[in-house]
């Protein structure tokens, strides 16, 4: 399962580009998988908490504490960085996407 391909439609290209930079800089920290919810902290100028909850049909419920998400209710670079991290966890066998 390619998480990135499945959910990229939720993010504007410019947001994906910026999130990819955050991911490759190693700013995704403190990742916690609890049942069907995955949370992390993403370090930039400030640290923000990003999270995704997957429903049984794999529909995601997203949240982030950054101003962009809070003010515009729009998916942000922190969330895309988290999706890239989740994709890596699945690819490396650290997470069974079908089980969440």
Listing of model-derived features with the role each one plays in the protein:
Residues 1-100:
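Long, low-complexity, compositionally biased intrinsically disordered regions
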């Amino acid at each position: 399962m390619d998480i990135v391909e499945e959910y990229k439609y939720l993010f504007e290209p410019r947001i994906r580009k910026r999130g990819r930079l955050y991911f490759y800089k190693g700013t995704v920290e403190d990742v916690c998988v609890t049942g069907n919810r995955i949370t992390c902290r993403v370090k930039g100028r400030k640290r923000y908490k990003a999270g995704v909850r997957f429903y049984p049909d794999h529909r995601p419920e997203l949240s982030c504490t950054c101003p962009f998400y809070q003010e515009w209710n729009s998916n942000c670079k922190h969330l895309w960085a988290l999706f890239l991290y989740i994709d890596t966890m699945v690819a490396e066998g650290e997470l069974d996407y079908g089980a969440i």
